[in-house]
């Protein structure tokens, strides 16, 4: 499954994995998964977290290691983002729910994920997705960017 990923995708997933893996031990626990999900505005129960982990926990040790994480991500990408998932993701970034993602919105979410970005990096992210040049990202631009992987 993970064989279909590009080197760039694997590098991105490695970075995401290390955001989840707070103690750097090479495994994601339910506690670490819960922390990240809550920072994204989700509120999963302990049972839901265990379900998510056991879904991809090939060696049944109760945690997700990087190869298991890659398989999960490859599977998720194959399921191509449903309309509902895209709407949810957009809502996470659109903090003030005005229908646009601003640089401040991106900065806020990335900071909650523990990712410190420079103003230039945030502006670059907005520029890449901003088709009409208004300095922010609307839902259509967001969908186009997410499906352009």
Swiss-Prot record:
Binding site for Ca(2+) 3: 94, 96, 98, 100, 105
GO cellular component: myosin II complex
Positions that bind Ca(2+) 2: 57, 59, 61, 63, 68
Keywords, alphabetical: Acetylation, Calcium, Metal-binding, Methylation, Repeat
Modified residues (N-acetylalanine): 2
Modified residues (N6,N6,N6-trimethyllysine): 116
PANTHER family listed in its UniProt record: CALMODULIN LIKE 3, MYOSIN LIGHT CHAIN 1, 3
Remarks, miscellaneous: This protein has four functional calcium-binding sites.
Protein name as annotated: Calmodulin-2
């Amino acid at each position: 499954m993970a064989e279909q990923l590009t080197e760039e995708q694997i590098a991105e997933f490695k970075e995401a994995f290390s955001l989840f893996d707070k103690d750097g031990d090479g495994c994601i626990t339910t506690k670490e998964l819960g922390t990240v999900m809550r920072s994204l505005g989700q509120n999963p129960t302990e049972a839901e977290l265990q379900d998510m982990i056991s879904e991809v926990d090939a060696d049944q040790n109760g945690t997700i290691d990087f190869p298991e994480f890659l398989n999960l991500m490859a599977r998720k990408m194959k399921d191509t983002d449903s309309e509902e998932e895209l709407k949810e993701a957009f809502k996470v970034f659109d903090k003030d729910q005005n229908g646009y993602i601003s640089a401040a919105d991106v900065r806020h979410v990335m900071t909650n994920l523990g990712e410190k970005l420079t103003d230039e990096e945030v502006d670059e992210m907005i520029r890449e997705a901003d088709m009409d040049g208004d300095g922010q990202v609307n839902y259509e631009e967001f969908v186009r960017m997410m499906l352009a992987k």
